Amino acid sequence: MGEPLLNNYTGEAHVPYDCILAGLRANPTREARFHRLDKNWLTPKAQSRPAGTKGHGSFALEKISRGETVAGFGGWVVTRSTLDTLDLDRQHRSIQVDEDLYLVSDETPEPGDHLNHSCHPSAVLIGSQVLVAWRDIEVGEELTFDYATCDDSDYDEFTCGCGEAQCRGTVTGQDWKRADLQEKYKGYFSPYLARRIAKENGEDVL
């Protein structure tokens, strides 16, 4: 299973992801349904603040260069059945990381909680938990990513208000299946979705 890994953001140790998956599958008790990973992290070059009808968002305080890490997702790994028992605010502050697994942050919002969707985002996923700037982000611009790159369920579907020319109008858990988005975000899907896309394309993957 491997030794505990070092948290990139705090220097503390956490349980390796494969250990968490094994624990969830081997022990369905309440204690096994919640496992602490890392806290959410937001670059000091950005700040979470009110964002009108979106609620809150994260905005650049200084210029962020393409390729810079801007946020890291952490929290509790839970299954969909457990996610559905949480209050709506915590459900909205979650990200899907595997077929039936989600990262949910603490009851009190953390700096990295407020990363909104955009159909033409300023950041993209690297792996399942890290966001990097997809282009240069100017002061005052919002840090966003496309939920199509991580979602495969209906837990967070909504009418989009990103305002981009490429806006899809509605964001669903099936958007990752679109050929145009698979081409646009090639290399930037959460690993479990990247594997599924590869399989659908006839590639031999795990």
What are these regions (language model features)?
Residues 5, 11, 17-126:
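Catalytic cores of histone-lysine modification enzymes
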